[in-house]
Amino acid sequence: MTNIRKTHPLMKILNDAFIDLPTPSSISSWWNFGSLLGLCLIMQILTGLFLAMHYTPDTSTAFSSVAHICRDVNYGWLIRYLHANGASMFFICLYAHIGRGLYYGSYMFQETWNIGVLLLLTVMATAFVGYVLPWGQMSFWGATVITNLLSAIPYIGTTLVEWIWGGFSVDKATLTRFFAFHFILPFIITALVAVHLLFLHETGSNNPTGIPSNMDMIPFHPYYTIKDILGALLLILTLLALTLFTPDLLGDPDNYTPANPLSTPAHIKPEWYFLFAYAILRSIPNKLGGVLALLLSILILIFIPMLQTSKQRSMMFRPFSQLLFWTLVADLLTLTWIGGQPVEHPYIIVGQLASILYFLLILVLMPTISLIENKLLKW
């Protein structure tokens, strides 16, 4: 009798995706982040569901309902902080996953890559609307500042902002719709993840060398299931350490003050995972220019397959490209630091230089150095 996992219509899909999937034998721990992102998504949906059972999306009770969750609900404090810090772990895994794709040339699977960029945008949107829900000072002002950026769009900007707000300022209508978005988006993300995997399994995984490995494949189970379990344990350990020892390390103290439209915080800034984009936005003195730079800082990922000039797919054997890649990583860390600093000298000029370098590295320096490396191959 044939095994049920190979004949049952539903089990067959799972079998082909997670059990008998032919996988390159040489993929490193950088390939763990895909499964870790899946784990993060499941954790966020589960903790979010339990939070939604006790949360009230109303301006007069939102803040106190979060306090109620932390004080009165059984293990409510744990669920709340797992959800908040789970978002940080989600973004750490996301950025590592994208970095892996850039380094090893995984972006050459164009459909998978484009769905991935769409996923990144959706996750960022989810995190943004979620940050507004506790209705603290930074929630309110973050929502006001970021939604206000749309007013930079010529002609329709102001109308668009008021339409999103559901009034003339961030108020009850805004909070209610943001809660609705925050609830529905994770399920849209889950559907996109299925499409992401569908496209990936059409081609099979890339590997560190960037060379087709069709002649050297091993089954996903047990080799990579056990490897993914190790990664998952390390992720959960890190998340629990963060949540139980320093739950507020990555949060903003201003969010422990209820939202007050009459009092603006000294420094309005988003969560740490958006700071690099926020720094790029602030480094341009023109509103529309800043918004365009902000958009382009993320959407530039779509153009990366078109900027591939190297004859080799991976950076594994390209030391000059490696140097530029790690310069880009350092540049993004610099932008993240600048995004959290006040707008004053010397941070302004450092932010502007880091922003210019970011676009210069991706659009000019990396494609150029790849061409030079091609020439060196002929020696």
Swiss-Prot record:
Annotated localization: Mitochondrion inner membrane
Matching CDD domains: cytochrome_b_C, Cytochrome_b_N
UniProt xrefs under Gene3D superfamilies: Cytochrome Bc1 Complex, Chain C (1.20.810.10)
Alphabetized UniProt keyword annotations: Electron transport, Heme, Iron, Membrane, Metal-binding, Mitochondrion, Mitochondrion inner membrane, Respiratory chain, Transmembrane, Transmembrane helix, Transport, Ubiquinone
Biological processes annotated in GO: mitochondrial electron transport, ubiquinol to cytochrome c
Gene Ontology CC annotations of this record: mitochondrial inner membrane; respiratory chain complex III
Cofactor note as given: Binds 2 heme b groups non-covalently.
Annotated a ubiquinone binding sites: 201
Pfam families: Cytochrom_B_C (PF00032), Cytochrome_B (PF00033)
Highest taxon in the source lineage: Eukaryota
Assembly behavior: The cytochrome bc1 complex contains 11 subunits: 3 respiratory subunits (MT-CYB, CYC1 and UQCRFS1), 2 core proteins (UQCRC1 and UQCRC2) and 6 low-molecular weight proteins (UQCRH/QCR6, UQCRB/QCR7, UQCRQ/QCR8, UQCR10/QCR9, UQCR11/QCR10 and a cleavage product of UQCRFS1). This cytochrome bc1 complex then forms a dimer.
Protein known as: Cytochrome b
Phylogenetic lineage: Eukaryota, Metazoa, Chordata, Craniata, Vertebrata
This protein's encoding gene: MT-CYB
